[in-house]
Amino acid sequence: MTLASIRRGYHVIKTLLQYGLDDVLPPKMTPWYFKLARNSLFWIRNKHKGKSGGERLKLAMQELGPVYIKLGQMLSTRRDLLSDEWANELAMLQDKVPPFDGALARQAIETELKAPIESFFDDFNETPLASASISQVHTATLKSNGKAVVLKVLRPNVEAKIQADLLLMSQTAKIIDYLLGEGNRLRPSEVIEDYRVTILGELNLKLEALNAIKLRNNFLDSDALYIPYVYEEFCYPRLMVMERIYGIPVSDIAALKAQGTNFKLLAERGVELFFTQVFRDNFFHADMHPGNIFISRDHPENPYYIGLDCGIMGTLSEVDKRYLAENFLAFFNRDYHRIAQLYIESGWVSEKTDLQAFEQAIKVVCEPMFNKPLDEISFGHVLLELFRTARHFDIVVQPQLVLLEKTLLYIEGLGRQLYPQLDLWQTAKPFLEQWMAEQVGPKAMFKKVSTKLPYWSDKLPEFPELIYDNLKLGRKLLSSQQQMLDKYLKYQQQAHKSNYLLITSAILLICGTLLFNQDATLWSPYVCLISGAALWIIGWRSRPKNRKF
């Protein structure tokens, strides 16, 4: 650990203590020697005793800077780990930081382009359009066609700063893991690893550009979603250039009302977009918070979404998708036994889990949800409560499902903000049922066979040779097994013979010793002893030497 990381660690601990976050730790983590060290190294008092633990954590992360703000935002989606009170506070963290110098942005852009900005762009504005913890955005026009574009560039030295903070977080998480011991539900190392993967993915703008291109191609003819065009020839790990858009922020409800937006259609399209991305394309935008979503200004009666920032994308395996769809359908059919089975069959919880106990725990959590109308039930909270319940049965955390849960909560919250009467179930159920029918029906089977047919046709001429090779290999295995069996039987016979001789020799030696004390003929003890010794030597030397078969 470097001196700089030690200083940073001291600053982080000091900040957390200033907000009295040691007060919320369990007693086993604050023994007398912890309190002694705290008072010796940090002459700090908690000045925020009137605030809740969640609010204090939010303020501390806000003060610690961008990396911790993003960590807090991620933690706000892990409601399977945190209480709603803490999660709601962290959700209010805003990734807004002062912009860095426009001259530095110009320098960073020209380093990536290996040419002056004016070689490719006109009207470059050194005053940023937007600024965040990892990057900031500048406007310009393309010299080749005059189209308006935005240039997204990483902050100077941001990678080194993030790596240093991640190392510190990882080391701290390991210490907390050790203190809490096995079986703790917080699992800090797991949380930090999820965060590390997420934030490092955001540091590669070339990857973000490729994600945006793929998502755009998936929705080229869509009336519901528009992804701005990416100029791939100008995209690098630290620079991304894309079409400039002029939509209305989805959070600006007043502006959307003023232009006469069809809120019902917009909310329903948001739900359809989510399920289309997950179940049709298996490629979903996993960072759909309001800052990344805009609404079209044209045709407010037929509005569409504009999606930005494709740095965090999610995918699911075919198995995950099937089990997820079945989970939702089983929940709304109140089939808790099937839900428990699905969690075990999918490998999300151990196969050793007590099925009846798990089913009962799911029923206790889910049954009260049906006390309210179906249109008020939240898909995201259903998934969340199921994960929370599974936590008590040692669920194997699936990062892709955590991303899905976060995205679903965003989409639901957004949909009900736009149109409070949104019936999520009625919107999603036909989609889920159609997808399930396509996966398990005759058409699905025919499609899978058709997909595999070219491969089988290509391999068909090789089948006779493969059969011959397998038969030949089988004969070799049988011959090898027979040889091993013969060796084993021979070993057993030798061992049996040796043991018989050793036992007999032991009996003769014991008898010879006893006869010395009895009224026996003079030669009897000697015969027994000599015979016993001879048999012992023969038995010992006849022991099988090699146990390898």
From Swiss-Prot:
<dbReference type="InterPro" id="IPR004147">
    <property type="entry name" value="ABC1_dom"/>
</dbReference>
<dbReference type="GO" id="GO:0010795">
    <property type="term" value="P:regulation of ubiquinone biosynthetic process"/>
</dbReference>
<keyword id="KW-0808">Transferase</keyword>
<keyword id="KW-0418">Kinase</keyword>
<keyword id="KW-0547">Nucleotide-binding</keyword>
<dbReference type="GO" id="GO:0004672">
    <property type="term" value="F:protein kinase activity"/>
</dbReference>
<comment type="pathway">
    <text>Cofactor biosynthesis; ubiquinone biosynthesis [regulation].</text>
</comment>
<dbReference type="GO" id="GO:0005524">
    <property type="term" value="F:ATP binding"/>
</dbReference>
<dbReference type="GO" id="GO:0006744">
    <property type="term" value="P:ubiquinone biosynthetic process"/>
</dbReference>
<keyword id="KW-0831">Ubiquinone biosynthesis</keyword>
<keyword id="KW-1003">Cell membrane</keyword>
<dbReference type="InterPro" id="IPR010232">
    <property type="entry name" value="UbiB"/>
</dbReference>
<feature type="binding site">
    <location>
        <position position="152"/>
    </location>
    <ligand>
        <name>ATP</name>
    </ligand>
</feature>
<feature type="active site" description="Proton acceptor">
    <location>
        <position position="287"/>
    </location>
</feature>
<dbReference type="InterPro" id="IPR011009">
    <property type="entry name" value="Kinase-like_dom_sf"/>
</dbReference>
<feature type="domain" description="Protein kinase">
    <location>
        <begin position="123"/>
        <end position="501"/>
    </location>
</feature>
<dbReference type="Pfam" id="PF03109">
    <property type="entry name" value="ABC1"/>
</dbReference>
<keyword id="KW-0472">Membrane</keyword>
<feature type="transmembrane region" description="Helical">
    <location>
        <begin position="498"/>
        <end position="518"/>
    </location>
</feature>
<dbReference type="InterPro" id="IPR045308">
    <property type="entry name" value="UbiB_bact"/>
</dbReference>
<dbReference type="InterPro" id="IPR050154">
    <property type="entry name" value="UbiB_kinase"/>
</dbReference>
<keyword id="KW-0997">Cell inner membrane</keyword>
<keyword id="KW-0812">Transmembrane</keyword>
<keyword id="KW-1133">Transmembrane helix</keyword>
<comment type="similarity">
    <text>Belongs to the ABC1 family. UbiB subfamily.</text>
</comment>
<feature type="binding site">
    <location>
        <begin position="129"/>
        <end position="137"/>
    </location>
    <ligand>
        <name>ATP</name>
    </ligand>
</feature>
<dbReference type="GO" id="GO:0005886">
    <property type="term" value="C:plasma membrane"/>
</dbReference>
<comment type="function">
    <text>Is probably a protein kinase regulator of UbiI activity which is involved in aerobic coenzyme Q (ubiquinone) biosynthesis.</text>
</comment>
<feature type="transmembrane region" description="Helical">
    <location>
        <begin position="520"/>
        <end position="540"/>
    </location>
</feature>
<keyword id="KW-0067">ATP-binding</keyword>
<protein>
    <recommendedName>
        <fullName>Probable protein kinase UbiB</fullName>
        <ecNumber>2.7.-.-</ecNumber>
    </recommendedName>
</protein>
